[in-house]
Amino acid sequence: VIRLGTRGSLLARTQSGLVADALARLADEPVELVVIATEGDDTSVPLDAPSRPGAFVSALRDALLAGSVDVVVHSFKDLPSAPAPGLVVAAIPLRAPHADVLVSRAGALADLPAGARVGTSSPRRAAALARFRPDLAVVPIRGNVDTRIGKVRTGEVDAAVLAAAGLHRVGRQDEIAEVIGADVLVPAPAQGALAVECRADSPLRATLAALDDLPTRLAVTAERAVLAGVQAACTTAIGALATWTDGRLELTADLSDHAGVGYARVNRGAHVTGLADADALGAEVARALLSQGTPTLRQAQGSSDGSSLPTGHPLLGPTADSPLIRSYRGVRTRHRAIWMMRQAGRSLPEYRAVR
């Protein structure tokens, strides 16, 4: 019996089940799902807490290294950019829809009334919402797909932004009010892709390779090279999306402060013949983002009283523990607004535009 480690959520078990079915056919051997609790499953602790890097994957990897399971399946966007010694991503199956989507009681993003509460705990999504609809209130919500949809249905929030792949995999695609285009919200690096991981010396490695989809691997390699190149943490508002067609990889990436005001966006394309080319393209885009973004963000991040945001990495947002009010003209922002930001303790910041 092949033991496949998975998180316990419906989405995790569903996508792991897809891999398990395919692996069982290839190996002509039964596959058993082994549910493993991860630190990230504790929704009472913010994902941006210092102890949380790799919160959704560390326990799975520990079980793999200990020999408790033979293979694990991750949502690829949850993997830290640094490789894990002794482990390999043996397969990246065909990617599911990569976009972000809106679940809403009031139609599309443009239709939401001013002041509507939009739920997300993703800095990337919050920053994009702040850029394109600064009159909305972005509030942190966590939980599985059903939980977040439920918060919309009960009125706790008016809308929520989720990954399309998750809704499709659990059969909730009918809940989608709008597929948000990459011109508004560039997906997270590797969003919609799965990472099938095993030990480097595993006899299953060759079998798992048959599940690999080359265009998906090339795209994800470029996207994650952007992530590594900007040394992004889980709280960084970064997006990257690559598409591979007829030997050419097109890559779009963006980077923002948490308020969505300081903003950099880069588009590059290159002919690729292998993973090294894809990695090089991602590294080039990362350098271009940092080069383009630094002066723009420094100019945009002034406050109404003449002070500036905290020093350090210019692409990270405010980190103060007390309410702040700042006036932004906004790079690529559709509206002028007075911004109020509140961050309580280690929770994600909440932003509201005040006219």
Explain the meaning of each model-derived region.
Residues 313-355:
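N-terminal basic, low-complexity leaders that serve as flexible interaction/assembly modules and, when applicable
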Residues 3-5, 72, 90, 119, ...:
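Short, well-ordered beta-strand segments
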Residues 69-73, 158-159:
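Short, Asp-centered acidic motifs that coordinate Mg2+ and/or phosphate
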Residues 76-79, 85-136:
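A conserved helix-loop-strand patch within extracytoplasmic ligand-binding domains
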Residues 88, 101-103, 193-197, 252-254, ...:
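Residues embedded in well-ordered beta-strands
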Residues 1-37, 43-50, 131-310:
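Small-molecule-sensing regulatory modules
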Residues 45-71:
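Short, structured active-site "lid" loops
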